[in-house]
Amino acid sequence: MENIGLPKSIKPRPYWIQYISAYIVFFLGLFVGKIKVQGRRNIPKEGPIVLASNHFAYFDPFLLVYAIHRPIDFIMQKELGIEPHFLFAPMIYGAILTDRNKVGPSIVKQSLNTIKKGKILGIFPEGGITSPTLTEAKPGAVYLASIANATVLPVSVRGASNAWDNIFRGVRSRIHVNIGKPFGPFDVKGSKEEKSKKLEMASRELMCRIAALLPDEKHGDFSGDPSIPVYQKENGLQTI
């Protein structure tokens, strides 16, 4: 089924709508699959938070709301579109639409506004559902976290790729959501070259921290990175 474009009317919804939606999502999650969430203790209780997760399936945002138990304003790339039967989700819950090639002033403004309201900003650093394994991150997540002086919360989601089809087959998918140790904020100040290098290094650290929450076969571009075992030990979560 071909993706359709995202309406321009999509924008972050009021807190009360997202709050009620989060409760609805919690109950729906009981039917979607057997969802195992690890690491809720790692969610900061206060302060600005940027949640960064891998993106293997359309159900990922839904599962992140289920796992975090708090409203999240997700950034979505308007060019990628969405499968028609999932359009209801961003229409009701809302999202921040962005251009895949740049982080414009309006995106920065909306993102900072989200954080000032005490909500979590949700970002998929890879830029969309691009691969069944991890790929290189775009610098947007780290950049927004740096200007907001926010803590970054790495999260992994797996097992939801066939969840939609399994629902109609009467099968509940086994889904795992792992929440890692928060890190940051970042300082990416300096010359253009220094800033670019800092963003690149911080983005790689972010993806390696997400990789540490996933089984080895999902590490993709980050397979064999020596920092992953260090983060795995730090998290102390099961990734099998």
Q: What positions do the PLM features span?
A:
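Short, basic, glycine/proline-bearing loop/turn elements
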Residues: 24-25, 92-98, 124-129
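A secondary-structure boundary/capping signal
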Residues: 39, 54, 76-77, 124-125, ...
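Residues at the C-termini of beta-strands that transition into short coil/loop
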Residues: 41, 78, 99, 156, ...
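Non-catalytic C-terminal accessory region of glycerolipid acyltransferases
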Residues: 1-16, 106-240
